[in-house]
């Protein structure tokens, strides 16, 4: 059985090919490469397309569907609209459309929003949106990899999203625009609200550079800013302050959910979260009283493949989210 998992990330589209539950290949296409590349042509370099049994697709915010749904039944790519969600390149749209037009069996994974029934009603009352689809994939990866039923997952990368899983179901959490900062994205504070009101910037522009990058002089675009700041941690005072401040904000976010986390398990993921120099997870652990696990690798794409694989084995529920797909 061969499945493909897709992570629609800020800096690019990552794909994981899995055969009989084992990772066969992982590849990434940077956002800026999509003008000259076809996703399916790249996928053909790794696997015969006719051999694929199912693809697990993550696209944008996923706020237009509330189940893991057969792509043939999804309208408008599973989103309400594409406004206010960060820098738009168009690569994810191209990948989605190529997959749908190919007729390869595929499911679209939703994001976490008010329509997701497994979420605690208080979180849904507080926030219209909690996470994009790949965060569900990352949570499922952690759930399977570490055999955990109760844990906090903090995915730290271009943005930071922190989720709580209780009794094997997604309970709630904080979206990228709410609490902790990522390298690029973060919550909008008073200064940014004033700039928005004065029409100096849009709310989306404010969110897109409200992360740790605002502390530095190191913005290098959506693909290269992370490495620029991390590599300068020991050499540049502003970059060090930016990373240390990110760690503080993530620690605060994790600790704010700990009273709802009965086993004190914490999983750190994301390209920044798994960084070893500086050791981000160790820095966060020093601020937090919990049992720490680090989910290495391309956790979103792998998790999407795990979801597709388990659906083929008859799974009808993924972390509390229903599956709407018929196995032929």
From Swiss-Prot:
What stretches pass through the bilayer? none
Q: Which InterPro entries match?
A: ATPase_NBD, Methan_mark_12
Disulfide pairs here are none
Q: Which HAMAP family match?
A: UPF0285
Q: Which family does it belong to?
A: Belongs to the UPF0285 family.
Protein name (database record): UPF0285 protein Mevan_1551
């Amino acid at each position: 059985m061969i499945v493909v998992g897709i992570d629609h990330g800020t800096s690019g589209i990552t794909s994981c090919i899995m055969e009989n539950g084992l990772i066969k290949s992982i590849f990434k296409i940077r956002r800026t490469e999509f003008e000259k590349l076809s996703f399916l042509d790249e996928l053909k370099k790794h696997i015969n397309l006719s051999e694929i049994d199912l693809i697990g697709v993550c696209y944008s915010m996923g706020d237009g569907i509330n189940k893991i749904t057969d792509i043939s039944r999804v309208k408008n790519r599973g989103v309400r609209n594409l406004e206010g969600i960060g820098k738009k390149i168009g690569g994810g749209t191209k990948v989605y459309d190529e997959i749908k037009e190919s007729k390869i069996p595929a499911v679209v994974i939703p994001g976490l929003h008010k329509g997701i029934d497994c979420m605690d009603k208080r979180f849904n009352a507080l926030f219209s949106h909690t996470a994009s689809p790949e965060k569900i994939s990352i949570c499922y990866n952690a759930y399977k990899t570490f055999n955990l039923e109760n844990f906090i997952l903090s995915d730290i990368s271009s943005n930071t999203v922190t989720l709580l899983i209780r009794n094997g179901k997604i309970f709630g959490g904080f979206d990228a625009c709410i609490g902790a900062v990522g390298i690029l994205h973060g919550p909008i504070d008073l200064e940014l609200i004033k700039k928005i009101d004065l029409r100096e910037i849009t709310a989306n522009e404010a969110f897109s550079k409200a992360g740790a990058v605002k502390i530095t002089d190191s913005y290098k675009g959506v693909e290269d800013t992370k490495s620029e700041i991390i590599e300068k941690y020991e050499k540049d005072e502003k970059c060090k302050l930016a990373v240390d401040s990110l760690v503080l904000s993530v620690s605060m976010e994790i600790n704010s959910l700990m009273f709802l986390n009965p086993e004190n398990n914490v999983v750190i993921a994301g390209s920044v979260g798994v960084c070893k120099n500086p050791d981000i997870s160790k820095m966060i652990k020093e601020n937090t009283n919990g049992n720490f696990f680090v989910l290495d690798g391309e956790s979103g794409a792998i998790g999407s493949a795990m979801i597709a694989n388990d659906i083929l084995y008859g799974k009808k529920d993924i972390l509390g989210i229903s599956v709407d797909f018929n196995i032929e």
